UniProtKB/Swiss-Prot annotation:
One of its GO terms (cellular component) is proteasome complex. NCBIfam families: pup_AAA. ATPase which is responsible for recognizing, binding, unfolding and translocation of pupylated proteins into the bacterial 20S proteasome core particle. May be essential for opening the gate of the 20S proteasome via an interaction with its C-terminus, thereby allowing substrate entry and access to the site of proteolysis. Thus, the C-termini of the proteasomal ATPase may function like a 'key in a lock' to induce gate opening and therefore regulate proteolysis. ATP binds at residues 296-301. Belongs to the AAA ATPase family. Homohexamer. Assembles into a hexameric ring structure that caps the 20S proteasome core. Strongly interacts with the prokaryotic ubiquitin-like protein Pup through a hydrophobic interface; the interacting region of ARC lies in its N-terminal coiled-coil domain. There is one Pup binding site per ARC hexamer ring. Upon ATP-binding, the C-terminus of ARC interacts with the alpha-rings of the proteasome core, possibly by binding to the intersubunit pockets. Pfam families: AAA, Prot_ATP_ID_OB_C, Prot_ATP_ID_OB_N. Residues 17-96 form a coiled coil. Residues 1-27 are annotated as: Disordered. SMART domains: AAA. This is Proteasome-associated ATPase.
Length: 609
């Protein structure tokens, strides 16, 4: 082959790919390759192909070795060049001057922008790479050393928290209150402006992407130096009070409270469903309902069932699908409202009713349910270490009696110490209807048991065989037997002996302290015993003995926790309201090995409720 072809085969590098330091070595390789070519040509020309085959083979091997060395050297040189370029870029980057940041205030038609940076407002030019039309007010922008906008960032995510007092008429500014009640006017960043623009405005968000509009009292993230509010910050203690959708509890899920359910339906549902009749008879619907009675007897369940039933009835009246019925149930636990800071509890109450009115203005029923009402709306003047009730109670009264009114809003309170609630809340015109949720008697207990012991449960084969395989009869017999055991006035069921001021004594049994929650506990214990029995014996199914054992365990567990209250409550339970209780003695000797013990009614009663 020709010399040029052989040069290409040898892979001789071009001058442009080499550095001056390696030229000597490459030149030496070229001379050596040229000498080898001459020797090869001389050998072929002088002795012929057959005679010099061995020499030709050696020369070709030598040429291949040189070509490989040349290729490796080229790769090394390329790698070194790339490293040099990377180092040069790093040096250039480290040598760049620092960038500054600012908040965009406004844009102009000549592609200049107003930016707040370093504590001053400046008009700056933009880099050609920046599309000024895409910039948004309140956005963070990056500036080079010449104070030219070179990059658009996001909106600020840290800053001070201020409270929105009101939105100004232009919709782009707001009055906020900061630390130490300092008022200031700030601009709203474009996301907040778009949230609050009216429907139909070209920049307004659609209903799917629009968050709720700003309201007085909202917390805003504010940059006080730039004068911008960037986003609404939800407060945890306020967001815990958000409106809950329709509860999934119906009246059919509640047992043993038929009379009380009828009372509350008359008080709540009739005014909503038959407004015309109420107007015709000039009858004012009640503003509120108080559910009171011992704990664990279904007060909260009834309130949730009211919201569920009301939503479905309203949907029927309007001709809507009952499955899409809507009402709102605002569940407020009294202790959640308490706050150590002066005025915070009252602010929470105002927010609760403000949100309730907003939802009710759409024609949707709203139920505001205060659980543990006695914990916050106590009788004024009874506080030992705090007088918070002196301002909280008037705040609730002003919301109920306020000039704004409570259209489509019903207030339901629940308490097991109704005697501690301020009387002003309970007078007619406020919580008009008062319904006592009593402890279940034997008939009510059977109804409650039937909600938990259903025919779908697996029953033991032996128990089923006694009733010829009739599951309904077996379940009914189970319920009757367990209720009979629970309500029997036998020695095993004795709990307390009460002594009255006139010397009379009365024995109280566990049935006097029974509740729906206790019945549910009994059934749950029995189901757990049935599961353990399956694991131990392999025989599936619930037995009557599981239920009877659960009653014994439940009574024994309550032995050390007698649900004692003040003497007036004891008199209310026993039916002797005119007699004062002076002495209480426990009669149970279950899991505790000690004998009957006395309870000092003067000091150890109130904390058990």
């Amino acid at each position: 082959m020709g010399s040029s072809e052989r040069s290409e085969a040898f892979g001789t590098p071009r001058e442009s790919d080499m550095s001056s330091g390696d030229e000597a070595e490459l030149e030496e390789l070229r001379r050596e390759a040229a000498m080898l070519r001459e020797q090869l040509e001389h050998a072929v020309g002088s002795h012929g192909g057959a005679r010099s085959a061995r020499d030709v083979h050696q020369l070709e091997a030598r040429i291949d070795s040189l070509a490989a060395r040349n290729s490796k050297l080229m790769e090394t040189l390329k790698e070194a060049r790339q490293q040099l370029l990377a180092l040069r870029e790093e040096v250039d980057r480290l040598g760049q001057p620092p960038s500054g940041y600012g908040v965009l205030l406004a844009t102009h038609e000549d592609d200049t922008v107003d930016v707040f940076t370093s504590g001053r407002k400046m008009r700056l030019t933009c880099s050609p790479n920046i599309d000024v039309s895409l910039l948004r007010k309140g956005q963070t922008v990056r500036l080079n050393e010449a104070l030219t906008v070179v990059e658009a960032g996001t909106f600020e995510s840290v800053g001070e928290i201020s409270t929105l007092r009101e939105l100004l008429a232009d919709g782009h500014r707001a009055l906020v209150v900061g630390h130490a009640d300092e008022e200031r006017i700030v601009w709203l960043a474009e996301p907040l402006v778009a949230d609050n623009l009216p429907d139909g405005h070209p920049d307004a968000l659609n209903d799917d992407t629009r968050p709720r509009k700003l309201r007085p009292g909202d917390s805003l993230l504010v940059d006080t130096k730039a004068g911008y509010a960037f986003e609404r910050i939800p407060k945890a203690e306020v967001e815990d009070l958000v409106l809950e959708e329709v509860p999934d509890v119906s009246y059919e899920d509640i047992g043993g409270l038929t009379r009380q359910i009828e009372q509350i339906r008359d008080a709540v549902e009739l005014p909503f469903l038959h407004k015309e009749l109420y107007r015709e008879y000039a009858l004012r619907p009640p503003k509120g309902v108080l559910l009171y009675g011992p704990p664990g007897c279904g007060k909260t369940l009834i309130a949730k069932a009211v919201a569920n039933s009301l939503a479905k009835k309203m949907a029927e009246v309007r001709g809507d699908d009952a499955r899409e019925a809507k009402s709102y149930f605002l569940n407020i636990k009294g202790p959640e409202l308490l706050n150590k800071f002066v005025g915070e509890t009252e602010r929470h109450i105002r927010l609760i009713f403000q949100r309730a009115r907003e939802k009710a203005s759409e024609g949707t029923p709203v139920i505001v349910f205060f659980d543990e009402m006695d914990s916050i709306f106590r009788t004024r003047g009874t506080g030992v270490s705090s007088d918070v009730e002196t301002t909280v109670v008037p705040q609730l009264l002003s919301e109920i009696d306020g000039v704004e009114g409570l259209e489509n809003v019903i207030v339901i309170g629940a308490s097991n110490r109704e005697d501690m609630i301020d009387p002003a809340i309970l007078r007619p015109g406020r919580l008009d209807v008062k319904i006592k949720i009593e402890r279940p008697d034997a008939e009510a207990a059977q109804d409650i048991f039937s909600k938990y012991l259903t025919e779908e449960l697996p029953l033991h084969a032996d128990d089923l065989a006694e009733f010829g395989g009739d599951r309904t009869a077996c379940i009914k017999a189970m319920i009757e037997k367990v209720v009979e055991r629970m309500y029997a006035e036998i020695d095993d069921n004795r709990f307390l002996e009460v002594t009255y001021a006139n010397g009379d004594k009365e024995v109280m049994y566990f049935k006097d302290f029974n509740s729906g929650a206790m019945i549910q506990n009994v059934v749950d214990r029995a189901k757990k015993n049935a599961i353990k029995s399956v694991l131990e014996t392999g025989q599936p199914g619930l037995r009557i003995q599981h239920l009877l054992d659960s009653i014994v365990d439940e009574f024994a567990e309550n032995e050390d926790l007698p649900n004692t209250t003040n003497p007036d409550d004891w008199a209310r339970i026993s039916g002797k309201k005119g007699e004062r209780i002076v002495y209480i003695r426990t009669l149970v000797t279950g899991k505790s090995s000690s004998a009957s013990r006395a309870i000092d009614t003067e000091s150890n009663l109130g904390q058990y409720l």
